[in-house]
UniProtKB/Swiss-Prot annotation:
Binding-site residues for ATP, renumbered to this chain: 33-38
Substrates-to-products reaction catalysed: cytidine(34) in tRNA(Ile2) + L-lysine + ATP = lysidine(34) in tRNA(Ile2) + AMP + diphosphate + H(+)
Cited HAMAP family: tRNA_Ile_lys_synt
This protein's name: tRNA(Ile)-lysidine synthase
SUPFAM superfamilies assigned to the protein according to its UniProt record, in alphabetical order: Adenine nucleotide alpha hydrolases-like (SSF52402), MesJ substrate recognition domain-like (SSF82829)
Enzyme Commission number, as recorded: 6.3.4.19
Free-text comment on this protein's domains from its UniProt entry: The N-terminal region contains the highly conserved SGGXDS motif, predicted to be a P-loop motif involved in ATP binding.
Amino acid sequence: MDRPGALDRLRTAVEAFSTAHLGAVERWCVALSGGPDSLALTAVAARLRPTTAVIVDHGLQPDSAAVAQTARAQAIALGCVAAQVISVHVDGEGGLEAAARRARYAALAAHRDGPVLLGHTLDDQAETVLLGLGRGSGVRSIAGMRPHDPPWCRPLLGQRRAVTHAACAELGLTAWQDPHNSDRRFARARLRAEVLPLLEEVLGGGVVEALARTATALREDNELLDALAERALPAARAGAGLQVAALAGLDAPVRRRVIRAWLLAGGATGLTDKQIRGVDNLVTAWRGQGAVAVGSSLPGERLFAGRRDGVLTLWREPVR
């Protein structure tokens, strides 16, 4: 039997994802950049259900408006019932890549009409795992992207990037090549061009798949620990704070997740593993140290987590 073509392989992947996660959904959106991954996904999605393409113009390149309009025209030609271009402002805070990602996801969330299909591939997952590992960002980063994290859907997370490129070729589509993807100033671009090929050569291949398997295993373990922390949190509460004595009786991975959930519920944002461990030290290595500062969801202020009379407490202070 002949091996299925690239487009058929993608269609099978999207259909399987839809059956597993989106059975009752009548329509969906696709985040379309014009690149080969999202373009191939759009082609498949539009053949399966009524599809709205959402194109986010970050305005980071001189021809970004033209690229967005080309993507819109391609979406309509591929059978999308609608296609809209959303222009966003990228503030650059936290680095250009991170700022663009925040702006993109905010725009998609605000303008979506149903679940949002994203064109992330197995290669993207491997890159994400390596970035998280290199930055010491904790288990959540190394666990990579979830296939289904409503409203975000990643039906191609098990497919290699080469398959989406081949699917575009089968359809005769000319995909946009984002210059940022080959710009060595960006860490992900260097991982893609230099680090992963070297690892594949040194380790004899299969590295991308191995990294993705590792992400899946870590994600499953992490979800179990999150569930244990959710059960433990009510017993540790002391009003708006947390009882140190109750926290001290928990296993370290569960305790840190209880602390994380408490911080997030209190309005913390952008939490790092270092910050969570700093708050954890207020429980396990208490010597009268000061509070731990964390980001706040409200502009113009910071949150502080400290210990007082055997209780962890949160308070806000204006940014000066």
